């Protein structure tokens, strides 16, 4: 294989890491839909609810940091969850700048169904427990870099 063929092979979309991640992410999110629709949740709302099931009340900042979402993304999600009667948002009496998120009784009632979904998704992925753990660790390593990201050159 000559050098040009090698370069073209590396450029092929199916060989791109970003395309593999994009395709896998889309598939996994689609796998969630039949489980989330009966709960009235979108995938991002589901992630917020899982974060809240770990303990409440929590600040918007804490949830955003855990999920890697900024306030501009998280606030509309929380407004929709609040409109659905699943969460409440209140100002922290100790620090008015902070907004506390808590589960309502309706939000708590979804806990068992929502918390059973990750296991169903893992089963649908048809990977061994070891492969799932390795994949999760690898993806977390990409999502949460251990050190500063190197400067990318665009030339």
What is the predicted function of each stretch?
Residues 1-39, 133, 141-144, 153-155:
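N-terminal leader segment of winged-helix/HTH proteins
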Residues 124-126, 145-154:
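Amphipathic alpha-helical linker/stalk segments
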Residues 19-22, 26, 30-70:
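N-terminal helix-turn-helix DNA-binding core of bacterial DNA-binding proteins
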Residues 34, 38, 54, 80, ...:
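Conserved amphipathic alpha-helical interaction elements at protein-protein interfaces in regulatory
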Residues 29, 57, 79-137:
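Charged, amphipathic alpha-helical coiled-coil/dimerization segments
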């Amino acid at each position: 294989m000559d050098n040009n063929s090698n370069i073209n092979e590396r450029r092929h979309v199916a060989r791109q890491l970003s395309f593999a991640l994009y395709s896998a992410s889309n598939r996994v999110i689609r796998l969630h839909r039949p489980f989330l629709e009966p709960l009235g949740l979108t995938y991002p709302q589901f992630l917020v609810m899982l974060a809240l099931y770990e303990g409440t009340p929590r600040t918007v900042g804490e949830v955003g940091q855990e999920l890697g979402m900024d306030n501009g993304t998280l606030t509309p999600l929380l407004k929709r969850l609040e409109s659905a009667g699943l969460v409440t948002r209140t100002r922290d009496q100790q620090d008015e700048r902070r907004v506390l998120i808590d589960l309502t009784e309706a939000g708590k009632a979804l806990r068992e169904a929502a918390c059973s979904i990750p296991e169903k998704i893992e089963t649908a992925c048809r990977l061994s427990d070891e492969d799932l753990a390795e994949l999760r660790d690898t993806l977390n390593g990409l999502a949460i870099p251990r050190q500063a990201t190197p400067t990318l050159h665009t030339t």
